[in-house]
């Protein structure tokens, strides 16, 4: 049974790792980083539901008896 020649494995693995590293660096360098998102302020209009407009009343506080 012939022996497996492993003399070139080191160079093959090393070149593969270097290639992966370079490709990953190129991919990261072309990535666009967006600025930090900020909340968008917009006018919010509260819409009253029909039951809110129908039953909305302003109650005065109870009058205290005069002393």
UniProtKB/Swiss-Prot annotation:
Residue(s) carrying N6-succinyllysine: 54
Alphabetized InterPro entries for the sequence: ATP8_mammal, ATP8_metazoa
GO CC terms: mitochondrial membrane; proton-transporting ATP synthase complex
GO molecular function terms attached to this record: proton transmembrane transporter activity
Disulfide bond annotation, renumbered to this chain: none
Subcellular localization(s) per the UniProt record: Mitochondrion membrane
Biological processes per GO annotation: proton motive force-driven ATP synthesis
Chief location bin: mitochondrion
Protein's name according to its UniProt entry: ATP synthase protein 8
